[in-house]
Amino acid sequence: IREAQQAVDTWIKTYGVRYFSELTNMACLTEEVGELARIMARRYGDQSFKDGENQDPSEEMADILWVLMALANQTGVDLTEALQKSIEKKTKRDATRHKNNPKLTADKKEKDL
């Protein structure tokens, strides 16, 4: 992740002139998440795609990562370190939580039958 953050930083400074403001990038991130949500709703929900509409979630996921990395760079967040801390936090907090959740284990039991 750290290398990708550096690549985003280099691209912005080389081709983008400078970073957009944090608020603008936050709005851009929200927009990209909305675009992914539209694809997911059409693919897995009840709506169908319109003619010519983007159906590729990977493109939108990559756009989300791009803007998230730009925001991280602007705010001094090392996403490699932050993700590791998040994994550790979730592991400590949820070590048995999901294994003991009947809502999750019921499906597994039904599939095993």
Regions found by a protein language model. Give the residues of each.
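Flexible "arm" and connector segments at domain edges
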Residues: 1-61, 65-113
